[in-house]
């Protein structure tokens, strides 16, 4: 079948070579020239930075106040223990955060299998070494495991509440991604007479909490969802103008009675239909002096009260009165 030069090829052959339970090689071909790197790089970035997973985010070790401590009877120092905790491959079924405990004493190796698990928590690598104990060694820990995405440094989870947390709760930089290694190569491919096509080979290894094939599938789904917005992209022939009322300072909506003026001044203002502070500040001194029974003494009082609130006479409000201010409100003000 002859293929038009203007027609884009889509991959017809997908091969999955399972190297181990945690590693696979996925081959995708044929691809138009350049699309191997385009898709390979996009999938690689998503696999490394956007895949959800679980990791230890906090550890509390008996007798340890900070990460630069050493524990009697334990071969590793605290920093080494924390590094080993980062290697745990954990799955949470249902919850987003759990607290687990580990208690071990006496000579021997402390592994992930020594962690006491809840019914909805699974450790994929139970043989993972956490520490080595001497005959007098004792290791008691509380581990907080959380669900997340990508890489999250310890200080990004700290808040004002963390300042009051008990000393000895050690925060860990956490890599939630189940992907341990991802690499891709682009090789030459051929379809009929076209020899300048691409073949994408992805070599992917996970920590065992997620199957490599499923990881690729999820990464492709994320990419597809992000690009979906561009598929239906269309510009409006005429921009839609949404009329939005400018925000008004709440103090302007308060009645003039809140200014606590003298009875004489307040009655003079109401006689001129000045019910709200927003009504008042738009009047000038000349206008107010024309008000019956309102003299210079009352005017000075009004100016001083407005100044104490950062206001003055003669101000202009383009959006006054607001639509939310009903006429009935003035009658009851």
Curated annotation (Swiss-Prot):
Entry keyword annotation includes S-adenosyl-L-methionine: no
Superkingdom, taxonomy of origin: Bacteria
UniProt xrefs under Pfam families: RNA_pol_A_bac (PF01000), RNA_pol_A_CTD (PF03118), RNA_pol_L (PF01193)
Biological processes annotated in GO: DNA-templated transcription
GO molecular function: DNA binding; DNA-directed RNA polymerase activity; protein dimerization activity
Reaction(s) catalysed by this chain's protein: RNA(n) + a ribonucleoside 5'-triphosphate = RNA(n+1) + diphosphate
CDD domains per the UniProt record, alphabetical: RNAP_alpha_NTD
Subunit structure: Homodimer. The RNAP catalytic core consists of 2 alpha, 1 beta, 1 beta' and 1 omega subunit. When a sigma factor is associated with the core the holoenzyme is formed, which can initiate transcription.
Family to which the UniProt record says this protein belongs: Belongs to the RNA polymerase alpha chain family.
Protein name: DNA-directed RNA polymerase subunit alpha
Annotated source species: Pseudomonas syringae pv. tomato (strain ATCC BAA-871 / DC3000)
């Amino acid at each position: 079948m002859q293929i038009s030069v203007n027609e884009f090829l889509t991959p017809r052959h997908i091969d999955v070579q399972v190297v181990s339970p945690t590693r696979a090689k996925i081959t995708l071909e044929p691809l138009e020239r350049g699309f191997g790197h385009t898709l390979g790089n996009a999938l690689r970035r998503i696999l490394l930075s956007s895949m959800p997973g679980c990791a230890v985010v906090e550890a509390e070790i008996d007798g340890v106040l900070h990460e630069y401590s050493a524990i009697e009877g334990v071969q590793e120092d605290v920093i080494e223990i924390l590094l080993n905790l980062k290697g745990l491959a954990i799955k949470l079924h249902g919850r987003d955060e759990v607290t687990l405990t580990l208690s071990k004493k006496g000579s021997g190796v402390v592994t992930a299998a020594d962690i006491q698990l809840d019914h909805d928590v699974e450790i994929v690598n139970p043989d993972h070494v956490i520490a080595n104990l001497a005959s007098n060694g004792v290791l008691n820990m509380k581990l907080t495991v959380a669900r997340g995405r990508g890489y999250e440094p310890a200080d990004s989870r700290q808040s004002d509440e963390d300042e009051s947390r008990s000393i000895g709760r050690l925060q860990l930089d956490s890599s939630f991604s189940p992907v341990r290694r991802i690499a891709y190569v682009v090789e030459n491919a051929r379809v009929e007479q076209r020899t300048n096509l691409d073949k994408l080979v992805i070599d992917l290894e996970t920590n065992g909490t997620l199957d490599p094939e499923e990881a690729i599938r999820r990464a492709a789904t994320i990419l597809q969802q992000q690009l979906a917005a561009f598929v239906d992209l269309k510009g409006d022939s005429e921009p839609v103008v949404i009329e939005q009322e400018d925000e008004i300072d709440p103090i302007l909506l308060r009645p003039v009675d809140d200014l606590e003026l003298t009875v004489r001044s307040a009655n003079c203002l109401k006689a001129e239909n000045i019910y709200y502070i927003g009504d008042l500040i738009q009047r000038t001194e000349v206008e107010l002096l024309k008000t019956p029974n309102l003299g210079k003494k009352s005017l000075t009082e009004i100016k001083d009260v407005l100044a104490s609130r950062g206001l003055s006479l003669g101000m202009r409000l383009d959006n006054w009165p607001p639509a939310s201010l009903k006429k009935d409100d003035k009658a009851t003000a």
